[in-house]
Amino acid sequence: MLIPRKVAHRKQHHPGRTGAAKGGTRVTFGEYGIQALESAYVTNRQIESARIAMTRHIRRGGKVWINIYPDRPLTKKPAETRMGSGKGSPEWWVANVKPGRVLFELSGVAEPVAREAMRRAIHKLPMKCRFVVREGGA
């Protein structure tokens, strides 16, 4: 699981989920990628589940890059607790994903295999995504 080793503050304000991604919108490391079409919080478990789905399909060949990291804690108060008495304890670690962000990249396999592997990974994610191919050039 992806979890930060050390954080300055245990609890954070909720980040904004509106607007488009400012960076990381192109496939840079691999040949193929998964691009988000909606904004969402992606938990560390969802990232790991998508990674496993991809790697199981491509078997031995290919390399996978994960371009997002769950560095924000989401808190939750216990069930049947009265309001007040502070913020709840950190429950999950999430990555704040905005539209246009490339989440995963893949190389070293044929396009049909990559397309199917990415399709399986997209089913594990909480938002609409699309398969993208690296643009020609440098």
From Swiss-Prot:
GO terms for molecular function: rRNA binding; structural constituent of ribosome; tRNA binding. This is Large ribosomal subunit protein uL16. Part of the 50S ribosomal subunit. Residues 1-16 have a biased composition (Basic residues). GO terms for cellular component: cytosolic large ribosomal subunit. It holds the Pfam family Ribosomal_L16. HAMAP family: Ribosomal_uL16. One of its GO terms (biological process) is translation. Belongs to the universal ribosomal protein uL16 family. The keyword tRNA-binding applies. PROSITE patterns: RIBOSOMAL_L16_1 (PS00586), RIBOSOMAL_L16_2 (PS00701). The lineage of its organism: Bacteria, Bacillati, Actinomycetota, Actinomycetes, Frankiales. Keywords: Ribonucleoprotein, Ribosomal protein, RNA-binding, rRNA-binding, tRNA-binding. It comes from the Bacteria. Binds 23S rRNA and is also seen to make contacts with the A and possibly P site tRNAs. Residues 1-24 are annotated as: Disordered.
